[in-house]
Amino acid sequence: VRRRVLEATKLTVGTVPLYEAAIETIRKTGSVIDMEADFLFEVIEKQAAEGIGFMAIHCGINRITLERLKRQGYRFGGLVSRGGSFLTAWMNHNKKENPLYDQLDRLIGIMKKYDVILSLGNGLRAGAVHDSTDRAQIQELIINSEVAEYAQKRGVQIIIEGTGNITIDEIESNDKKKKRMSNNAPFYM
């Protein structure tokens, strides 16, 4: 399907390669916790070589953000990001760092080689307005902002995913806060 979409349009096409890697692993073994980091990077490179223009990659979920989430406690909306859920399950079971964060130079090398825009996913976005801009989400934004700066210094274009569910009166102040924290990195909502 992806190849046919790429052939049918001149528009920039984006993917979330973690989904393909996770689903393929689940089909083979029955669980995302069996996913191999090398397989995830193979999927990323394969999609980049096919001509994907941007990829949503969840680098901001790491041991630090998961510890922040744990200390914070209950979230009304839980963890609503599919990519965030896959990575959290994988990290907790395997007691390992997120390979997308841990092997950041490898990821950036692929993005640069194929001129793919790195879209930093928000795996801890709020699933309910009650959780908007909570500590875990802010911690992920800090990590994503650091990754964005690191990638840009290495010649990779980036965008950062927006906030998730917030009340309408929080949008402007939230956007200003995120722009300030990320050194004015481009966001999309």
Where are these regions (language model features)?
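Alpha/beta enzyme core
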Residues: V1-K178, S182-M189
